[in-house]
Amino acid sequence: MPANATRKQIIDTADALFYAQGYAQTSFADIAAAVKISRGNFYYHFKTKDEILDAVIDKRLADREAMLASWDETAEDPAKRIACFIRIVIVNKAKIMAYGCPVGTLTSELAKLDHASKEKANQIMALFRDWLDRQFRELGCGSKSEDHALRVLGWSQGVATLAQAFKNEAYVQREVAEVLEWLNTVAEEVGPRRDA
């Protein structure tokens, strides 16, 4: 396998293991065994677990940037783009019910560990906040945009946490429906109704 392909496989595998097991609970040996490479080959690509973590955070950030960019391209107005973000808890509900939100769980774990990469991981939350803020501004919410963005972001993290704890799909569906209705109300306040 070419070196770049091996490196990518290590990052993808570490990403999945960090999500399912947590960063602290995942060892070099776990990742090497899952990738089926020797430790020597592993060390050729990454000397420390922190180097792998930084690569995983970079991957998650790039993946989320691509997701948001695709919504920017495919959803015709900001309310529909915000609705895409809201519905992500349904789209990913099986994984969320099993492991929680991949962004929220990682930022929380790194904060508890007071890990040097916690600020880098927080960039993903900041990406979501800033993107949502832009969508609400484009919708016409003005000075309320950041508050609305944080409300949606906080809501998504809360639903992900409770979905993981209680494994209740009906709850997730109800919460999504309620926050979409709230979004429609916000959109009505600034212009004609646009069902999200």
Which residue stretches match the model-derived regions?
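Helix-turn-helix
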Residues: 6-9, 13-51, 55
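Hydrophobic/aromatic-rich alpha-helical bundle segments in the mid-to-C-terminal region
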Residues: 103, 115-126, 137-196
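Hydrophobic alpha-helical connector segments
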Residues: 55, 69-99, 149-152
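Short, basic, alpha-helical segments at the C-terminal edge of helix-turn-helix-like DNA-binding modules
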Residues: 58-65
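Amphipathic alpha-helical segments used for helix-helix packing
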Residues: 81, 95-116
